Amino acid sequence: MVQIKAAALAVLFASNVLANPIEPRQASVSIDAKFKAHGKKYLGTIGDQYTLNKNAKTPAIIKADFGQLTPENSMKWDATEPNRGQFSFSGSDYLVNFAQSNGKLIRGHTLVWHSQLPSWVQSIYDKGTLIQVMQNHIATVMQRYKGKVYAWDVVNEIFNEDGSLRQSHFYNVIGEDYVRIAFETARAVDPNAKLYINDYNLDSASYPKLTGLVNHVKKWVAAGVPIDGIGSQTHLSAGAGAAVSGALNALAGAGTKEVAITELDIAGASSTDYVNVVKACLNQPKCVGITVWGVADPDSWRSSSSPLLFDSNYNPKAAYTAIANAL
């Protein structure tokens, strides 16, 4: 059905003059444009220099169908500051330049995270030194892309499954206050960027991790910590899409201005699951956008579970068509 519909659409719209030529197998109007028509900011995906150059179909699909890009790895600490005070931006510059030249919003990912953290950072046990290093890292990375990045994941994956704060290196050395320091540093560097806390397994309203995050965010926001949004990664197992609506509504009650689905992929990529997630964002006024964590299955970190909207041949799946029709 997808191939038949795509072929018909290709004939129907072959004569149209479009600013961004689309792949003939895709919908005539991008799913991003359809999503924005409902008042949302973007329906995006991820990219980096390797994946953008690996297969020519990847940038073509991004240009045709997605309105936002998140760097998969090139803005993480190990990529941007592998040695203390020695910054490297070649990978992140490539992604930002591609996004800007093609009119895509950018979500910066990620500034403070316990993983992909260089050993030199993990070897710092003096509180004052680690605070200075963290602030310098945030300031240097954000300053380079000031005015170019719509939103930043300032802190990433800082909660345990029981809703308590993860005992990361930053937590163990600085204490909970590292969260406030990180957000206040980020706000000072780029007052116009949206500042997010991002985490996974926030997919059920009653799950302890979600309720713990909401309670902490309420406390931080009330104390003046400049958290603008909550990002729910939304890496789902098959059949889990139905619970996302309730989860987003719960996250929206934490007191931030925005929520977003930041790393969406769904095992099996069923049409029902994907449409449920898209509708969950559509129906929550604070949900500004969705980022799918990859274009096609071969480039997914969960490739064996076929979780994305495009298959191993970079052709759209039934879930892609279902989203286009639902919008």
From Swiss-Prot:
The keyword Signal applies. It catalyses: Endohydrolysis of (1->4)-beta-D-xylosidic linkages in xylans. Pathway: Glycan degradation; xylan degradation. SMART domains: Glyco_10. The modification Pyrrolidone carboxylic acid is found at residue 26. InterPro entries: GH10 (IPR044846), GH10_AS (IPR031158), GH10_dom (IPR001000), Glycoside_hydrolase_SF (IPR017853). Residues 55-326 form the GH10 domain. Its EC number is 3.2.1.8. It is found in: Secreted. Disulfide bonds join 281-287. The keyword Signal applies. Keywords: Carbohydrate metabolism, Disulfide bond, Glycosidase, Hydrolase, Polysaccharide degradation, Pyrrolidone carboxylic acid, Secreted, Signal, Xylan degradation. It is an enzyme of class 3 (hydrolase). GO terms for molecular function: endo-1,4-beta-xylanase activity. The active site is at 157 (proton donor), 263 (nucleophile). Pfam families: Glyco_hydro_10. One of its GO terms (biological process) is xylan catabolic process. Residues 1-19 form the signal peptide. GO terms for cellular component: extracellular region. Belongs to the glycosyl hydrolase 10 (cellulase F) family. This is Endo-1,4-beta-xylanase.
